[in-house]
Amino acid sequence: MAPLFLPLLATLVLAWIPVALADALEGDSSEDRAFRVRIAGDAPLQGVLGGALTIPCHVHYLRPSPSRRAAQGSPRVKWTFLSGGREAEVLVARGLRVKVSEAYRFRVALPAYPASLTDVSLVLSELRPNDSGIYRCEVQHGIDDSSDAVEVKVKGVVFLYREGSARYAFSFAGAQEACARIGARIATPEQLYAAYLGGYEQCDAGWLSDQTVRYPIQTPREACYGDMDGFPGVRNYGVVDPDDLYDVYCYAEELNGELFLGAPPDKLTLEEARTYCQERGAKIATTGQLYAAWDGGLDRCSSGWLSDGSVRYPIVTPSQRCGGGLPGVKTLFLFPNQTGFPNKHSRFNVYCFRDSAQPSAIPEAANPASHLASDALEAIVTVTETLEELKLPQEAVESESRGAIYSIPIIEDGGGGSSTPEDPAEAPRTLLEFETQSIVPPLGSSEEEGKVLEQEEKYRGEEEKEEEEEEEEVEDEALWAWPSELSSLDPEAPLPTEPVPEESLTQASPPVRAALQPGVSPPPYDEPEAPRPPRVLGPPTKTLPTPREGNLASPPPSTLVGAREIEEETGGPELSGAPRGESEETGSSEDAPSLLPATRAPGDTRDLETPSEENSRRTVPAGTSVRAQPVLPTDSASRGGVAVAPSSGDCVPSPCHNGGTCLEEEEGVRCLCLPGYGGDLCDVGLHFCSPGWDAFQGACYKHFSARRSWEEAENKCRMYGAHLASISTPEEQDFINNRYREYQWIGLNDRTIEGDFLWSDGVPLLYENWNPGQPDSYFLSGENCVVMVWHDQGQWSDVPCNYHLSYTCKMGLVSCGPPPELPLAEVFGRPRLRYEVDTVLRYRCREGLTQRNLPLIRCQENGRWGLPQISCVPRRPARALRPVEAQEGRPWRLVGHWKARLNPSPNPAPGP
């Protein structure tokens, strides 16, 4: 007996040792674990379609060891998603380094990590139906790791709804009522887009909550291209007339009660079905309730009546015997075009709904084979074929608009033209007086180059491009045919067109004096009482021998007396501030070039260079200096003339109205007003918008509800002398969004360069209000134009430019009328009735004339054009000269466009 017992005992001991050792090791491992990961909350966590969900995950350290953890660095956090037996990585983070999977880009975040090493909660936004599943939170720190998992359920379903009588039968108001009638609500664009990302497809146009009409397409096909051609996505017809008829996309979410199938042996008519449910303390279910139950897992292969007279059944596990190979709520129609509900006397089962205080669990899905459709289904067809897309009016079906925007003629006056300014304010001014002793260059003196200051004139405007050919002429004499009275803008004083005889060159002319306030805006073209700019008097009279006669006379040198300052105490309109785009070193003003004498500098006989289309060069005669004058705040300069006593010693809150800028100065607070406003606090309107336009902070706005593509809308705005609205401040954003509550175009676009967004009116991009995730240009679909979504705080989204939306036009409160007409020059470009402030136009001389002086004029802030300075003189025919030899080492001189020798010998060498 003993020999048998000992081997058995030894076997038992050997079998027990590994088990005990494993238990001991496991216990030690549990005791040595540094932390544990836990996901708080009741499972499953529920989120709503298109919304956001926070999955809480916290790290609990069992035995804190700060020094050890600090040496190990930040923990590694990994979130994974498990669904259908497959695992996918969501994100991995360690410290500030985060890697996000492409499917979750811009949708997930760790809001507390790494600031908090114990809170690694995940925020998942823009929830989609396929976001339902298991989420696992895993943390690794050194050699320790721990994880936890939780189930997430995304509830909410978007579905297309239509009346049984016909396709596309709902107006916008009727669509909202229809969704409410079936226990749902009209879906939002975000919900439809989230459903699309979850795989939803429907080739039927339907209303959404923002009054747009859209439909989602996963597989593009000829009948369902919409506005996206061959790309998948949500097709969008834009905001349409509320009386137009379409289907509607509804959204169902909660099922606060129990939905069950009533299946009596003899089936039921519609009225019998209502009675059947009432006898059981329930009522016949609505379509929205059935969709919510299907979204919760209800699977019944048995068609039943619903409250709207439709017959449907929910399928979670698809089969060929139960509606084909796709899950969803199946609907029975009488006709292949998916219209016609079954006759109310037909017999089917019924879906009933019983209210409860708390949402009840959906009954477990039964085996589809146990709930076969009734024999009555033989006369009913379940349509699964592809239907033809709704044919919209021609303007809504077009290819995307691309390319540049071209100017169009003005056909309507938008209230342009300049208004008469207010009476001039009493303020000191500084006058400049120029004295010119002679206008004839000294031919006998040594040549001195005049100082030329070059400045780029950057200007905007719709000007025609014209290629100009510069002709180098060889003249036998200097041409002094200056445009008489041109500077005074007198249309009755024509310029001389006949060549000046050789015998009529002047030796000297009387002094010429001009007195203008620096920065004073020139009056409009037709005001005779306006101060005149410097004027050049008299044609030359003294005869000088021609080069053929062998000598050239040297008239007395001319002297240009410097500017003299004269202080006066008198009233008069003034403009202050440095000219825009010009440095102080030039010593000249954009608005005061008329202060310069209309003569050439001593020793400089060259014509002014004709500026090109891109830039122009301004020539300031040598020896002329114009000192920068003090800036005098006046109403005409759109600044308050009297200091406002500060209430708190600063500009908070700002006392200025109408978008004025508050400036703190030693004497108090001063308001810098926008164009069109004046007064101490910018509370006085100096200009007003045309009837039908709304004024806000120096601009006028007009909203148009007619739907157009972006390019058509921009062209319509240009017909008024305006552009699609540009937005530069949050206040302007709120004004447009709150006043014109529509899904509308704005002027922002990247039609020229992808990703480089610019305003159509050329103002810089100083403010942005993009929707999260925008701009995205989804699937390279040509989303080059920007819309403002009013129901979402006016945030912006980029969409294809051929959408048809309403739009708002914007123009400046102050504008200029047609430019001054000159007798010998005309303006480039097509004429318009109004021009925005800072618009620059260019004159060109008529054929046969040569241009001198700057040809540009600018629309100023007071609604008046700057004074034209261009001079047009007759062009002399070229005359060949016989070459002569130089003597005594005297150099050749350039006089006009020909060369001549000083004091030539009496016997010049013969020509060739």
Curated annotation (Swiss-Prot):
The signal peptide, as residue positions, is: 1-22
- Where is each C-type lectin domain found? 683-811
- Basic and acidic residues bias: start-end ranges: 448-463, 603-617
Cysteines joined through disulfide linkages: C57-C137, C179-C250, C203-C224, C277-C352, C301-C322, C651-C662, C656-C671, C673-C682, C689-C700, C717-C809, C785-C801, C816-C859, C845-C872
- Show where the Ig-like V-type domain sits: 36-155
Q: How is it modified after translation?
A: O-glycosylated; contains chondroitin sulfate.
Glycosylation site positions: N130, N337, S418
Q: Which residues carry this modification: Phosphoserine?
A: S418
Q: Where is the composition biased (Acidic residues)?
A: 464-478
Region: Disordered, residue numbers: 408-427, 438-651
What are the protein's UniProt keywords? Disulfide bond, EGF-like domain, Extracellular matrix, Glycoprotein, Hyaluronic acid, Immunoglobulin domain, Lectin, Phosphoprotein, Proteoglycan, Repeat, Secreted, Signal, Sushi
Molecular function terms, GO-annotated: carbohydrate binding; hyaluronic acid binding
Superkingdom as given in the UniProt entry: Eukaryota
List locations, semicolon-separated.
Secreted, Extracellular space, Extracellular matrix; Secreted
The tissues in which it is expressed are:
Brain; expressed in cerebellar astrocytes but not in neurons.
Biased composition regions of type Pro residues, renumbered to the chain: 520-537
Q: Which residue intervals define the domain Link in the entry?
A: 157-252, 257-354
What's a BP term from Gene Ontology annotated to this protein? central nervous system development
Q: Which residues form the EGF-like domain?
A: 647-683
State the protein's purpose.
May play a role in the terminally differentiating and the adult nervous system during postnatal development. Could stabilize interactions between hyaluronan (HA) and brain proteoglycans.
Task: Kindly state the subunit structure of this protein.
Answer: Interacts with TNR.
Protein family (similarity comment): Belongs to the aggrecan/versican proteoglycan family.
Q: What is this protein called?
A: Brevican core protein
Q: What is the lineage of its organism?
A: Eukaryota, Metazoa, Chordata, Craniata, Vertebrata
